[in-house]
Regions:
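Short loop/beta submotifs within extracellular cysteine-rich repeat domains
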Residues: 29-30, 60-61, 72-73, 130-133
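Vicinal oxygen chelate
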Residues: 5-13, 52-60, 66, 69, 75-144, ...
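Conserved active-site tyrosine of GNAT-family acetyltransferases
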Residues: 18-23, 102
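Short secondary-structure junctions
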Residues: 27-40, 104-114
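Short, tandemly repeated low-complexity microdomains enriched for cysteine and small residues
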Residues: 32-37, 73-79
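N-terminal strand-loop-strand beta-hairpin
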Residues: 29-57, 126
């Protein structure tokens, strides 16, 4: 079952811009349990740096995606749409079962080889079947 919103992914041109908004202006804190500091987590297939920012009590995070080149999927997204919302991610206590149910209910799973996503670790669903929202589902790790 989908249990909660795990994170919301945003794309920014630099960590400094994301940090300024989320930490300095909103007053949130970096989620040190999920972020390798100071350089952020590196996602090689997408050539992207990733930082997790904890919202309030910490059950939901903002995943800040910073492209490291101009040709990756995240970089192309930034170039085409500018900084902002990239995806929403729900936590699941039965990941593969929930992914199967979502497909049965009409969502379109993004398959391997479709851009920068890695659906083997976390299924993604195409925006065209979800009100224009790229959707990800991850295993519920609890409060981290």
């Amino acid at each position: 079952m989908l249990t909660r919103v795990d994170h919301v992914g945003i794309v920014v041109p630099s960590w400094e811009e994301g940090r300024r908004l989320l930490l300095d202006q909103f007053g949130f804190a970096i989620n040190e349990a999920r972020t390798r500091l100071p350089e952020g987590n590196y996602y090689a297939p997408g050539n992207t740096r990733i930082y997790f920012v904890r919202i309030g009590g910490g059950e939901t995070n903002v995943e800040v995606l910073v492209p490291q080149d101009s040709v990756s999927g995240i970089a192309q997204f930034l170039h085409k749409r500018g900084p902002g919302l990239h995806h929403i991610c729900y936590a699941s206590d039965a990941l593969e079962e929930d992914a199967r149910i979502l497909v049965e209910r009409g969502l379109e799973r993004i398959l391997p080889g479709s851009g920068d996503v890695n659906p083997e670790s976390a299924p993604f669903f195409h925006p065209r079947a979800a009100l224009g929202i790229l959707t990800e589902v991850v295993r519920d790790r609890g409060r981290r």
